[in-house]
Protein backbone atom coordinates (compact mmCIF):
# COMPACT_ATOMS: atom_id res chain seq x y z
CA UNK A 1 0.00 0.00 0.00
CA UNK A 2 2.79 2.41 0.93
CA UNK A 3 4.66 1.48 -2.23
CA UNK A 4 1.61 2.14 -4.40
CA UNK A 5 1.05 5.47 -2.67
CA UNK A 6 4.69 6.45 -3.24
CA UNK A 7 4.46 5.56 -6.94
CA UNK A 8 1.22 7.53 -7.28
CA UNK A 9 2.79 10.59 -5.62
CA UNK A 10 5.87 10.34 -7.85
CA UNK A 11 3.70 10.10 -10.96
CA UNK A 12 1.66 13.10 -9.87
CA UNK A 13 4.79 15.19 -9.28
CA UNK A 14 6.18 14.24 -12.70
CA UNK A 15 2.97 15.18 -14.45
CA UNK A 16 2.66 18.41 -12.50
CA UNK A 17 6.21 19.41 -13.35
CA UNK A 18 5.79 18.93 -17.11
CA UNK A 19 4.17 22.33 -17.88
CA UNK A 20 6.83 24.15 -15.84
CA UNK A 21 9.65 22.30 -17.56
CA UNK A 22 8.08 22.98 -20.95
CA UNK A 23 7.96 26.67 -20.16
CA UNK A 24 11.67 26.95 -19.38
CA UNK A 25 13.66 28.52 -22.23
CA UNK A 26 16.84 27.01 -23.61
CA UNK A 27 19.52 27.32 -20.89
CA UNK A 28 22.11 28.67 -23.34
CA UNK A 29 19.97 31.65 -24.48
CA UNK A 30 20.25 34.00 -21.50
CA UNK A 31 21.03 37.22 -23.40
CA UNK A 32 18.70 39.16 -25.67
CA UNK A 33 19.26 42.31 -27.72
CA UNK A 34 16.82 43.99 -30.09
CA UNK A 35 15.58 47.14 -31.78
CA UNK A 36 12.06 48.48 -32.17
CA UNK A 37 10.10 51.32 -33.77
CA UNK A 38 6.67 52.89 -33.54
CA UNK A 39 4.75 56.12 -34.23
CA UNK A 40 5.14 57.86 -30.84
CA UNK A 41 4.88 57.37 -27.08
CA UNK A 42 1.93 58.56 -25.00
CA UNK A 43 3.92 60.90 -22.76
CA UNK A 44 6.68 61.88 -25.18
CA UNK A 45 4.08 62.54 -27.83
CA UNK A 46 2.08 64.57 -25.30
CA UNK A 47 5.09 66.76 -24.44
CA UNK A 48 5.97 67.43 -28.07
CA UNK A 49 2.34 67.61 -29.17
CA UNK A 50 1.52 70.21 -26.49
CA UNK A 51 4.41 72.39 -27.64
CA UNK A 52 3.28 72.02 -31.26
CA UNK A 53 -0.33 72.84 -30.33
CA UNK A 54 0.47 76.12 -28.61
CA UNK A 55 2.91 76.97 -31.38
CA UNK A 56 0.21 76.33 -33.97
CA UNK A 57 -2.26 78.44 -31.98
CA UNK A 58 0.15 81.35 -31.90
CA UNK A 59 0.84 81.02 -35.62
CA UNK A 60 -2.87 80.99 -36.43
CA UNK A 61 -3.40 84.19 -34.46
CA UNK A 62 -0.42 85.70 -36.31
CA UNK A 63 -1.81 84.55 -39.69
CA UNK A 64 1.20 82.34 -40.43
CA UNK A 65 1.20 78.84 -41.90
CA UNK A 66 3.11 75.95 -40.36
CA UNK A 67 3.83 72.26 -40.95
CA UNK A 68 4.84 69.55 -38.47
CA UNK A 69 6.68 66.30 -39.17
CA UNK A 70 7.01 63.60 -36.53
CA UNK A 71 10.10 61.38 -36.66
CA UNK A 72 8.57 58.43 -34.79
CA UNK A 73 10.09 56.52 -31.86
CA UNK A 74 13.04 54.12 -32.02
CA UNK A 75 14.56 51.99 -29.29
CA UNK A 76 17.45 49.64 -28.51
CA UNK A 77 17.07 47.18 -25.65
CA UNK A 78 19.03 44.45 -23.87
CA UNK A 79 17.70 41.82 -21.46
CA UNK A 80 19.19 39.04 -19.36
CA UNK A 81 17.11 35.96 -18.54
CA UNK A 82 17.20 35.35 -14.75
CA UNK A 83 14.77 32.42 -14.83
CA UNK A 84 11.95 31.10 -17.01
CA UNK A 85 9.59 33.97 -16.07
CA UNK A 86 11.77 37.03 -15.36
CA UNK A 87 14.16 39.19 -17.42
CA UNK A 88 16.04 42.33 -16.38
CA UNK A 89 17.68 44.79 -18.74
CA UNK A 90 17.90 48.33 -20.03
CA UNK A 91 16.12 50.28 -22.78
CA UNK A 92 17.16 53.40 -24.74
CA UNK A 93 14.59 55.34 -26.78
CA UNK A 94 14.58 58.44 -28.96
CA UNK A 95 11.70 60.31 -30.61
CA UNK A 96 11.18 63.78 -32.00
CA UNK A 97 9.53 66.23 -34.35
CA UNK A 98 10.28 69.17 -36.65
CA UNK A 99 7.96 72.15 -37.08
CA UNK A 100 8.44 74.69 -39.88
CA UNK A 101 6.79 78.11 -39.47
CA UNK A 102 6.29 80.36 -42.49
CA UNK A 103 6.11 84.15 -42.75
CA UNK A 104 2.50 84.12 -44.01
CA UNK A 105 -0.37 81.84 -44.94
CA UNK A 106 0.93 81.53 -48.52
CA UNK A 107 4.22 80.03 -47.26
CA UNK A 108 6.24 82.67 -49.08
CA UNK A 109 9.32 82.14 -46.89
CA UNK A 110 10.40 80.21 -43.80
CA UNK A 111 10.25 82.20 -40.56
CA UNK A 112 11.62 79.58 -38.16
CA UNK A 113 12.28 75.86 -37.70
CA UNK A 114 11.75 74.11 -34.35
CA UNK A 115 13.20 70.68 -33.56
CA UNK A 116 12.36 68.68 -30.42
CA UNK A 117 14.05 65.43 -29.41
CA UNK A 118 13.30 63.22 -26.40
CA UNK A 119 15.83 60.64 -25.19
CA UNK A 120 15.19 58.12 -22.40
CA UNK A 121 17.37 55.56 -20.61
CA UNK A 122 15.33 53.15 -18.49
CA UNK A 123 16.25 50.03 -16.52
CA UNK A 124 13.59 47.46 -17.36
CA UNK A 125 12.02 44.24 -16.09
CA UNK A 126 9.87 41.74 -18.00
CA UNK A 127 7.55 39.06 -16.60
CA UNK A 128 6.89 36.17 -18.98
CA UNK A 129 3.57 34.43 -18.32
CA UNK A 130 3.61 32.15 -21.40
CA UNK A 131 6.97 30.71 -22.40
CA UNK A 132 7.43 28.28 -25.27
CA UNK A 133 10.44 27.68 -27.53
CA UNK A 134 8.92 29.74 -30.37
CA UNK A 135 6.46 32.08 -28.60
CA UNK A 136 6.69 34.22 -25.46
CA UNK A 137 3.98 36.44 -23.97
CA UNK A 138 5.07 39.01 -21.41
CA UNK A 139 4.37 42.25 -19.57
CA UNK A 140 6.90 44.68 -18.14
CA UNK A 141 7.81 47.96 -16.49
CA UNK A 142 10.57 50.55 -17.04
CA UNK A 143 11.78 53.41 -14.86
CA UNK A 144 14.64 55.80 -15.57
CA UNK A 145 15.54 59.28 -16.79
CA UNK A 146 14.54 61.32 -19.84
CA UNK A 147 16.12 64.28 -21.62
CA UNK A 148 14.29 66.84 -23.77
CA UNK A 149 16.36 68.84 -26.26
CA UNK A 150 14.85 71.75 -28.21
CA UNK A 151 16.52 73.65 -31.03
CA UNK A 152 15.03 76.70 -32.77
CA UNK A 153 16.27 78.57 -35.82
CA UNK A 154 14.45 81.91 -36.06
CA UNK A 155 15.42 83.69 -39.27
CA UNK A 156 13.56 86.87 -38.27
CA UNK A 157 15.93 87.59 -35.36
CA UNK A 158 19.50 88.89 -35.22
CA UNK A 159 20.46 85.84 -33.13
CA UNK A 160 18.62 83.13 -35.09
CA UNK A 161 19.63 80.08 -33.05
CA UNK A 162 18.42 79.09 -29.57
CA UNK A 163 18.62 75.84 -27.63
CA UNK A 164 17.00 74.44 -24.50
CA UNK A 165 17.10 71.19 -22.56
CA UNK A 166 15.52 69.54 -19.51
CA UNK A 167 15.87 66.29 -17.59
CA UNK A 168 12.78 64.51 -16.27
CA UNK A 169 11.76 61.11 -14.80
CA UNK A 170 10.83 58.58 -17.49
CA UNK A 171 8.69 55.49 -17.08
CA UNK A 172 6.80 52.94 -19.13
CA UNK A 173 4.44 49.99 -18.68
CA UNK A 174 4.27 47.21 -21.27
CA UNK A 175 0.70 45.97 -21.01
CA UNK A 176 1.19 43.25 -23.63
CA UNK A 177 4.20 41.91 -25.48
CA UNK A 178 4.84 38.93 -27.74
CA UNK A 179 8.09 37.48 -29.13
CA UNK A 180 8.00 34.95 -31.98
CA UNK A 181 11.19 33.05 -32.79
CA UNK A 182 14.13 31.31 -31.08
CA UNK A 183 17.58 32.76 -31.70
CA UNK A 184 16.14 35.42 -33.99
CA UNK A 185 12.69 36.82 -33.24
CA UNK A 186 10.12 39.45 -34.08
CA UNK A 187 8.20 41.37 -31.43
CA UNK A 188 5.01 43.35 -30.95
CA UNK A 189 4.16 45.47 -27.90
CA UNK A 190 1.45 47.71 -26.47
CA UNK A 191 2.91 50.35 -24.14
CA UNK A 192 1.86 53.27 -21.95
CA UNK A 193 4.58 55.75 -21.03
CA UNK A 194 7.76 56.76 -22.85
CA UNK A 195 7.92 53.81 -25.24
CA UNK A 196 5.84 53.73 -28.42
CA UNK A 197 2.22 52.85 -27.65
CA UNK A 198 2.37 50.38 -30.56
CA UNK A 199 5.80 48.94 -31.32
CA UNK A 200 7.25 46.40 -33.76
CA UNK A 201 10.80 45.11 -33.63
CA UNK A 202 13.37 42.37 -34.17
CA UNK A 203 16.09 40.87 -32.01
CA UNK A 204 18.49 38.02 -31.32
CA UNK A 205 19.31 35.72 -28.38
CA UNK A 206 22.52 34.00 -27.43
Give the positions of each predicted feature.
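Gram-negative (and chloroplast) outer-membrane scaffold detector with strong preference
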Residues: 39-41, 69-152, 178-180, 184, ...
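Residues that define the transmembrane beta-barrel architecture of outer-membrane proteins
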Residues: 29-31, 68-74, 115-121, 135, ...
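Glycine-rich phosphate-binding "P-loop"
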Residues: 142-172
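Short glycine/proline- and aromatic-enriched beta-strand/turn motifs that initiate or cap beta-hairpins
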Residues: 21-80, 203-205
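Outer-membrane beta-barrel translocator domains and adjoining extracellular loop/strand segments
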Residues: 45-53, 100-108, 149-159, 198-203
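Extracellular loop and loop/strand-boundary signature of outer-membrane beta-barrel proteins
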Residues: 60-64, 106-113, 157-164, 185-187
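Cleavable N-terminal export/targeting peptides
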Residues: 1-30
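Transmembrane beta-strand segments that form the barrel wall of outer-membrane beta-barrel proteins
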Residues: 181-194
